[in-house]
Every structure is written in structure tokens, then in C-alpha cells.
């Protein structure tokens, strides 16, 4: 997807809040915006629509 592995790591290595869809750090345990604790890892696969 990205041209460089460093860029891909920076873009895809995130957690997403299930409530407000905010991007958070990988080591986060709660959302930085709303405080929700249900975070998922950002999907790595490319979806074509």
C-alpha cells in the first residue's frame, strides 16, 4: 500500500475507537477523545469498493 515500510507502519499501526472512530496510539487502553475503552486495531487489508 505505502511506498516505504516506515510510512506503512506509521499509517497502519493504530487503534480505532469503536464509539467515535478516533485514531489512537497502539499502546492506548482508552480513547483520547471520548475515554471509551473498547478499541480495535486498525484493519491492515485494503478494501476495494
Curated annotation (Swiss-Prot):
Pfam families for the chain: Ribosomal_L40e (PF01020)
GO BP terms, alphabetized: translation
One Gene Ontology cellular component: ribosome
Protein name per its UniProtKB record: Large ribosomal subunit protein eL40
MF annotations from Gene Ontology: structural constituent of ribosome
Recorded family membership: Belongs to the eukaryotic ribosomal protein eL40 family.
Database matches in PANTHER family: 50S RIBOSOMAL PROTEIN L40E, LARGE RIBOSOMAL SUBUNIT PROTEIN EL40
This protein's encoding gene: rpl40e
Keyword vocabulary terms for this entry: Ribonucleoprotein, Ribosomal protein
Amino acid at each position: 500500500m505505502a511506498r516505504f515500510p516506515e510510512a506503512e507502519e506509521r499509517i497502519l499501526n493504530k487503534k480505532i475507537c469503536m464509539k467515535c472512530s478516533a485514531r489512537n496510539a497502539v499502546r492506548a487502553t482508552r480513547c483520547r477523545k471520548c475515554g471509551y475503552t473498547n478499541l480495535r486495531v486498525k484493519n491492515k487489508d485494503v478494501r476495494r469498493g
